[in-house]
């Protein structure tokens, strides 16, 4: 049995779970999430816990078992506490600002880059070089953070660009030759 899949998911107070066939809807203080799961996985609500069961020990069912449980846990966690991803801007003159709902990045291009967050995702700019992305959907928060980072990925020579908060950029040495040649 999958070690992750067999763990029950505790449903906290104030979180409402609706099971309609293979479509699960979770509603909590931070919002509502709905997702369709594989029809082979059997999801039940027993004594305040969500339990995922699989029909057989086939390889694909074992893989889906852990995946389904983790996705359900992320849904419950998201509507209860929410998820946050932090980004940092490294570079002279690199700034982030918020205009209404949009994020405006000044990162060395000839034009400012504007990014509109999807519904249910909130962008905060606590400092000119810091960005915080918050939301109840873990996948959407992570995807938006990856899209913002992709606008100007950190380069290996000076480390300039947009990086995740605790990301370590592997640095390279610059050109060594060319000093004594004429």
Swiss-Prot record:
The keyword Protein transport does not apply. Disulfide bonds: none annotated. SUPFAM superfamilies: Ribosomal protein L6. Keywords: Ribonucleoprotein, Ribosomal protein, RNA-binding, rRNA-binding. One of its GO terms (biological process) is cytoplasmic translation. One of its GO terms (cellular component) is cytosolic large ribosomal subunit. It comes from the Bacteria. GO terms for molecular function: rRNA binding; structural constituent of ribosome. Part of the 50S ribosomal subunit. This protein binds to the 23S rRNA, and is important in its secondary structure. It is located near the subunit interface in the base of the L7/L12 stalk, and near the tRNA binding site of the peptidyltransferase center. This is Large ribosomal subunit protein uL6. It comes from Desulforamulus reducens (strain ATCC BAA-1160 / DSM 100696 / MI-1) (Desulfotomaculum reducens).
């Amino acid at each position: 049995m999958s070690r992750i899949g067999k763990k029950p998911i505790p449903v906290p107070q104030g979180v409402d779970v609706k099971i309609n066939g293979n479509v699960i809807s979770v509603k909590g203080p931070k919002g509502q999430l709905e997702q369709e799961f594989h029809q082979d996985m059997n999801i039940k609500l027993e004594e305040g816990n969500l339990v995922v069961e699989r029909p057989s020990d086939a390889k694909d069912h074992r893989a889906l078992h852990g995946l389904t449980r983790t996705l359900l846990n992320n849904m419950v966690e998201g509507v209860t506490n929410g998820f946050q991803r932090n980004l940092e801007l490294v570079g002279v003159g690199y700034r982030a600002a918020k205009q209404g709902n949009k994020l405006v990045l000044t990162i060395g291009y000839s034009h400012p880059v504007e990014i509109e967050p999807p519904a249910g995702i909130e962008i905060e700019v606590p400092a000119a070089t810091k960005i915080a992305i918050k939301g109840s959907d873990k996948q959407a928060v992570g995807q938006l953070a990856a899209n913002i980072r992709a606008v100007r990925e950190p380069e290996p020579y000076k480390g300039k660009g947009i990086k995740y908060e605790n990301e370590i950029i592997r640095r390279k040495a610059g050109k060594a030759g060319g000093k004594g040649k004429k």
